[in-house]
């Protein structure tokens, strides 16, 4: 059984036991998380009806808070001597999916 959940502006296809990296969620490692915005559930039959999905919830456990890979930004303007370097590492949360309840 799998479900498609939306968190952090992105959609993820998850099943029980999966570990997914999502945008940063508040909470300590080991705490419980529930994903409310559910888009699709597949079990014996596929459910995409909004009324039926309101009863479904996906729960997970926070595994750890991490950072993504370093992204380097370099702005440059020709002939003026202007250049600017900047780096960024996105904060991520690893979540282990513990249950999909219908």
UniProtKB/Swiss-Prot annotation:
Q: Which GO terms describe its biological process?
A: translation
Task: Give the matching Pfam families.
Answer: Ribosomal_L21p (PF00829)
What family, per the record?
Belongs to the bacterial ribosomal protein bL21 family.
Q: Which GO terms describe its cellular component?
A: cytoplasm; ribonucleoprotein complex; ribosome
The keyword Zinc is annotated on this UniProt entry:
no
Alphabetically sorted, this entry's keywords are: Ribonucleoprotein, Ribosomal protein, RNA-binding, rRNA-binding
Q: Which HAMAP family match?
A: Ribosomal_bL21
Give the protein name, as stated in the record: Large ribosomal subunit protein bL21
Q: Which organism is it from?
A: Saccharopolyspora erythraea (strain ATCC 11635 / DSM 40517 / JCM 4748 / NBRC 13426 / NCIMB 8594 / NRRL 2338)
- Signal peptide (residue range): none
Q: How does it assemble?
A: Part of the 50S ribosomal subunit. Contacts protein L20.
Q: Name one GO molecular function term.
A: structural constituent of ribosome
The role this protein plays is:
This protein binds to 23S rRNA in the presence of protein L20.
